[in-house]
Amino acid sequence: MRGRRTGEGAIRRDSQNTILRKRFSGGFLSLAGANSPGGLSFRPVPILFFDEVDRFAPSAGTEGDPIRLAFARTSTFPNRKKIEVSSPSIKGKSRIEKNYETSSQAEYYDPCPACGKAQVLRFRQLDFQSGNCRCVECCELFAKHQWLDRWDERGAWVHKCPDRSTRGFWLSGRQPLDQLGNARNRI
């Protein structure tokens, strides 16, 4: 039969399992475009995830800000969550930049493999000759894997403004996504 697997864990295509909606044990996933007022206000949800918010149009049709429109759908959930992710666009006009500036502003500090100095790895620490990163304290060069081998063991998220209620995290492209999930236990 088309759209069906037989046996244990069978998945069936129906109104609960479409391209934009996936139902699974314990919940569901519903996808909507930022330009779709109907999709953004479709049903109450406890968790919202927005990807590339700096590329959102200022208005979802004639309904207004897409994030405000979708966030209104969480009002019935006291433990609601809103997650916004984006590469910043134009300085001073970036939605994610503005959100980060009003958040706790957490950055991940890695310990140097040699001296142990905790630091946020920056592009300026990259040695272009070797492709390695230089420690700001001892000036030793280390390959990326040497910094990241202990990523989740000794590093730490440091919040510049810990008293702010909104948690914001600056993620660099060098941080392995599979290890970011483990960090939630230490935030």
PLM ranges: what are they?
Residues 1-187:
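Short, flexible loop motifs at catalytic/binding sites
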